[in-house]
Amino acid sequence: MMLGVIADDFTGASDIASFLVENGLSAVQMNGVPKQPLNSRVDAIVISLKSRSNPANEAVEQSLNAYNWLQENGCTQFYFKYCSTFDSTAKGNIGPVTDALLEALNEDFTVITPALPVNGRTIFNGYLFVGEQLLSESGMKNHPITPMTDANLMRLMDAQAKGKTGLVAYADVIQGAARVKERFAELKAQGYRYAVVDAADNSQLEVLAEAVAGLKLVTGGSGLGAYIAARLSGGKKGTNAFTPTKGKTVVLSGSCSVMTNKQVEKYCEKAPHFQLDAAQAINNPNYAEELYQWVTANLDAPLAPMVYATVPPEALKAIQNEFGADKASHAIENTFAQLAAKLKRYGVTNFINAGGETSSIVVQQLGFSGFHIGKQIAPGVPWLKAVEEDIYLALKSGNFGKEDFFEYAQGMFV
């Protein structure tokens, strides 16, 4: 059986791909929907889209295109991968995409499990937690694109999907896969189309991986993907992951998450750093060139130069109020994209990126068709190597990694 993964952003794609490889599957990550058939044999194909914050109709179209290609290339079970903090409001697209994939597969039931306990994302009684905080009380309530003000996954799903969402509670999950499958049958009989499944630690994800073996569509974060991979590989562990070659390196940080703010603050103590100015990104057509000149002048420093748009919540709100959230974010993303392209032409070979939107736009601009999956820098954040040439990327979702992430990643160079 070949697993086909449809990921709604690039950091999410590398997140789940790293867990698949770590748990014994051979996998390749594709940058968007390929135009040609896959010419290598693998256990899993991960397609990375840039659809997380898109209007529902656009996300559905992208996801169905990915599904069709995966099916044509031999995949028989499909995994819709979204963020472990859900990142989808009432206007979001997780519900519509899930519905579209169910209909394409002629199926009427699937699971909703964004849990990733290794990074503090757990589900209890259908509520999503980030560490000890409810999702709605965490830093995600201030997300610039998808502010998460409700932690109840049943309500979140019902607000955006066609069907009803039920719960497989912790008390059922700890009884094992047979009981979970019984609950699936009970919920289906009661007219539920989706089941949020509690997962307070990895043992519940291991149970769920067995319970969903017969489902053609599974949805969730990378945590469940890891245990599906472990089941498919028979518990084999991946051993051939690479680390990057030392070379010209840059850090680009666009995330405004709580952890990325801490990581940026810590890195600023040791490395050359330049804070991207939103007004300049919007109004100055030469801004990317000015940033490029600064980066290239600092490439010989002991630690890589960093360009960052990362700011605390209060500063982010001020930027959004002054310029508009969409206008500011698009200008900043476009500046990062132009800068990355210039730096690649200059000879930069290692790109460390923080933030899903930043990573997505940088990868699109660099134009690679796919990536080999390397060693993990942190859970869910592997090194990637472009299939076309020796360019290495780290694509970090906002809240992933420890405070020393940027320096630690460079310590892995060989």
UniProtKB/Swiss-Prot annotation:
GO molecular function annotations of the record = ATP binding; kinase activity
Name the chain's protein: 3-oxo-tetronate kinase
Protein's organism: Actinobacillus succinogenes (strain ATCC 55618 / DSM 22257 / CCUG 43843 / 130Z)
State what this protein does: Catalyzes the ATP-dependent phosphorylation of 3-oxo-tetronate to 3-oxo-tetronate 4-phosphate.
Residues binding ATP, per UniProt: 255, 355-358, 398
Q: Which reaction does it catalyse?
A: 3-dehydro-L-erythronate + ATP = 3-dehydro-4-O-phospho-L-erythronate + ADP + H(+); 3-dehydro-D-erythronate + ATP = 3-dehydro-4-O-phospho-D-erythronate + ADP + H(+)
Enzyme class comes to transferase
What domain of life does the UniProt record list for this protein's source?
A: Bacteria
In short, the EC number is: 2.7.1.217
- List, alphabetically, the SUPFAM superfamilies matched: YgbK-like
